Amino acid sequence: MYRELISHKIAELKKERKAIILAHNYQLGEIQDAADFVGDSLELARKAAKVDAGVIVFCGVHFMAETAAILSPEKIVLAPEPRAGCPMADMISGAELREFKSRHPGLPVVCYVNSTAEVKAESDICCTSANAVKVVESLKSDTVLFVPDQYLGAFVKERTSKKIISWPGYCPSHARIKPEDIVNLKKHYPAARVIVHPESRPEVTALADEVLSTGQMVSYATRADVKELIVGTEIGMLYRLRKENPDKLFIPVSEQAVCANMKMTTLPKLLASLENMQTVVSVPEEIRVKAVGAVERMLRVV
């Protein structure tokens, strides 16, 4: 009853504020249910760039709300939980990227969207896990710098002819997914397909039937002619997969693959955000104008 009451208040305030609620696939189920749109980083970036609403309430982690603010400076972007950061995004700073570039002069920088606005501003083009291969292939250079995710960089390297020089960052949640977990689960579910996220270690992706972004996982789960899927990504993804495919069995590779930051946003925090119009996320204009080019170039890659 309490949850229904909060959800009703959120829906009312959303109309009053002329707001749209965007949520990442890793958010709590209650947040996904309250959202107008749920998706992966690429889908959310595209949505943020096109929405008519004057207020965007972003339920995710900080870099996602920042990306929305970069793309839509005329809109109010709210983060219900401003402390929700991204450990991988914090593994490289703008200064560190500038030093990295100085050691490899002239090479283009492909920046995973899981990064700060400052790092995006120092990059040539952004990418997400859904379009990383296409983005790298779109560049003329035979060698590219890839930041900050070394495992996504390794995934791209296997699928292109280009030389990838990666920054040694990683996602702690996906790093908890172990190959032996997949091997053990396959013994119990021999008919199951294995789908994993490209932020996983190479020895994990090597055991997968498909390596997919979270948005691609949703599409694959719906169309795949299989009743059992072993899923290697952050545990929040299982909520949407099960909700949209109640006739299928989804087994997490690891219950330890949890992003605590993604779970910080709750219904009461979402309600408070709309009530008080907080917390506004903004990017300094001198950084935004540099970062927006990298993000928009990514969005132009089909």
Swiss-Prot record:
It catalyses: iminosuccinate + dihydroxyacetone phosphate = quinolinate + phosphate + 2 H2O + H(+). Binds 1 [4Fe-4S] cluster per subunit. GO terms for biological process: 'de novo' NAD biosynthetic process from L-aspartate. InterPro entries: NadA, NadA_sf, Quinolinate_synth_type2. Its cofactor is [4Fe-4S] cluster. PANTHER family: QUINOLINATE SYNTHASE, CHLOROPLASTIC, QUINOLINATE SYNTHETASE A. This is Quinolinate synthase. It comes from Dehalococcoides mccartyi (strain ATCC BAA-2100 / JCM 16839 / KCTC 5957 / BAV1). The gene is nadA.
